[in-house]
A protein has these predicted regions:
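Class II aminoacyl-tRNA synthetase catalytic cores and aaRS-like
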Residues: 1-617
């Protein structure tokens, strides 16, 4: 039986303080270099690399073992730490090396399908299929460790501030609102299903009614929706709720949490209070409700300048109730040719813009397609509006308010990336407040809740719920960082009458409202306190702090872009008996696909066993 002796320290921590000491190390062989009389071994663990040295004076047995090592072998090394003759400044342990006296091979390794090092080019499918190997790479490990640091800081903050960590159920009831639920069939109640939670929203509100006052949870959530780079079917929320709290209270605690996380994880002193911007100002200045406030290039409403313009594209749009909005790109006059600008015009068509007008301002003169329509008054107004100094490209969109906002938001982000004005290593937070209670969903053709149907309207909004609900404003707030929504929250409805009016405004019938949420409305009649809360998306937050482009890079075992897991081959067909126990039968139109999947998985397993198994040896 292998005896595992106590490790002295991690490989990456063997620095000058250990010189002259005997150490016992464990790790993976990163590289072996045999120079004849000397063998150098780079030994790796989660903290980094240390160089192991074996020379001919160590004896033939040790030299033979060292020479037999392959990449990714798991070994135990004993030896003395000595000062290196040549320092390697690129390694944390570059001042020292370990003069080995014993090497024990704990396990051998086949040649991996890709090299275990940073900066390799390998497909995501291969990385996920061999995720246990991918996770050995330092940059991947550091992203997972960073996520762990966020979790630790979160637990510490909430514990220090009197919050109670309460787990809410994973198996709950389906609600057809929002994204699709993941359903779990019940064997005990055939034909009935649990739903995995999209959030613990109602449970945490009920906990406030139960008198717990301060709740938090690192909540696992599930949504069956189309995937993007920043989405996974399962994800984690930093979830909090408080009784007897207003917007400022929740925002203050959130800022305290963010301040601790930024300090503990990134070593950054976050300045608080975090600035606020209203939803309306955010839309008008940045074109979106997730403003990237790291740079300028703000959107300007130019409608007053062009309402009487001879350029009918502008004046006509304004006359039809639309707007003319624009942005100025510094040094854009030389950077962007007509061909490049035409590509931008094509780009914004996906946001329903009809076109892109533009002028350049150079050497005190305007040029470009729109320049001939500009009066002297227009020119002076534009120079003043944008504070033009020379060399700018000014682009315009004339359309409905929402189209102008969407188009210029995406253009602004594109121009910022291309012109290099986004500062590196900056984490800029902003609160977006004073949201509309409802937003119009073009696809559904009706008004829907801007956040969720349990959000409290402001005082005027409570009155508008029964008359003009689409004009109501919400007591809600989102926290945004670098143009990405980190989280959001609101004051919650705590009275039955307001909750019923909210459901009415959303088009619920009484029957539907009480079938889905009767328990909540009954609870609101049982002495429910005013309460509020917020949730932060841990995965997205970790992704941004780790400077990654994909949430999959900060999840240990993520799904791919098709919501499947190539290593375990999930999802996969199950045995007929399992389906029969649940009263489920696969429709005939899907049976060929299921059979093909079963055959493919069986073939892969058989090939794996034939090539690699020691079963019959």
């Amino acid at each position: 039986m292998e005896k595992i002796e106590k490790r002295t320290d991690y490989c990456g921590n063997i620095t000058e303080k250990y010189i002259g000491q005997d150490v016992n190390l464990y790790g993976w062989v990163q590289r072996v270099r045999n120079l004849g009389n000397l063998v150098f071994i780079d030994l790796r663990d989660r903290e980094g690399l240390v160089q192991i040295v074996v020379n001919k004076d160590s004896g033939k047995k040790l030299m033979d073992i060292a020479d037999s090592l392959g990449n990714e072998y798991v070994v135990q090394v004993k030896g003395k730490v000595v000062k290196r003759s040549e320092v390697n400044p690129d390694m944390k342990t570059g001042q020292v090396e370990v003069d080995a006296t014993e090497i024990i091979i704990l396990n051998k390794a086949k040649n991996p399908p890709f090299e275990i090092k940073d900066g390799i080019e390998v497909s995501e499918q291969t990385r996920l299929k061999y995720r246990y190997l991918d996770l050995r790479r330092p940059e991947v490990q550091q992203a997972i460790i960073l996520r762990s640091k966020i979790l630790r800081a979160t637990h510490e903050f909430f514990d220090e501030n009197g919050f109670i960590d309460i787990e809410t159920p994973i198996l709950g009831k389906s609600s057809p609102e929002g994204a699709r639920d993941y359903l779990v069939p019940s064997r005990i109640y055939p034909g009935s299903f649990y739903a995995l939670p999209q959030s613990p929203q109602l449970f945490k509100q009920l906990l406030m009614g139960a008198g717990f006052d301060k709740y938090y949870q690192l909540a696992r959530c599930f949504r069956d929706e189309d995937l993007r780079g920043d989405r996974q079917p399962e994800f984690t929320q930093i979830d909090m709720e408080m009784s007897f709290a207003d917007e400022e209270t929740i925002q203050s605690y959130t800022e305290g949490l963010l301040k601790k996380i930024m300090k503990d994880v990134k070593g950054i002193d976050l300045k608080t209070p975090i600035k606020r911007i209203t939803w309306t100002d955010s839309m008008n200045k940045y074109g979106c409700d997730k403003p990237d406030t790291r740079y300028g290039m703000l959107i300007h409403d130019l409608s007053p300048i062009f309402k009487d313009s001879d350029f009918k594209v502008f004046s006509g749009a304004i006359a039809d109730g639309g707007f003319v909005k624009g942005i100025a790109v510094k040094n854009g006059a030389k950077e962007y040719s007509r061909k490049k600008i035409d590509k931008k015009a094509d780009f914004i068509k996906r946001f329903h813009a009809k076109g892109l007008a533009w002028v350049k301002f150079e050497d005190g003169e305007f040029s470009g397609p729109v320049a001939r329509f500009l009066t002297d008054e227009n020119k002076e107004a534009l120079k003043k509006e944008f504070d033009l100094e020379g060399g700018e490209l000014v682009v315009f969109v004339a359309d409905k308010w929402k189209v102008c906002c969407d188009s210029l938001d995406h253009l602004r982000r594109e121009f910022a990336k291309e012109t290099g004005i986004i500062p590196k290593g900056v984490y800029d937070f902003v609160w977006v407040v004073d949201w509309p209670l409802f937003e119009y969903d073009e696809g559904l053709g009706r008004w829907v809740a801007a956040h969720h149907p349990f959000t409290m309207p402001d005082d005027e909004g409570v009155k508008l719920l029964t008359t003009e609900p689409h004009k109501a404003h919400a007591r809600s707030y989102d926290i945004v960082m670098n143009g990405d929504e980190m989280g959001g929250g609101s004051i919650r409805i705590h009275k039955r009458s307001i909750q019923e009016n909210m459901f009415k405004a959303l088009g619920f019938t009484k029957k539907r409202a009480y079938e889905q949420f009767g328990y909540l409305m009954d609870a609101l009649d049982m002495g429910f306190p005013p309460h509020a809360g917020l949730a932060i998306g841990l995965d997205r937050f970790a992704m941004m702090l780790a400077d990654k482009d994909n949430i999959r890079d900060v999840s240990a075992f993520p799904k791919n872009a098709s919501a499947s897991e190539p290593m375990m081959h999930a999802p996969a067909p199950v045995a007929d008996q399992q389906l029969a126990d649940l009263g489920i039968e696969v429709e005939e139109k899907y049976q060929d696909s299921v059979k093909a999947t079963e055959e493919r998985l069986e073939k892969m397993a058989a090939e794996d066993a034939a090539e690699n198994s020691t079963w019959d040896k």
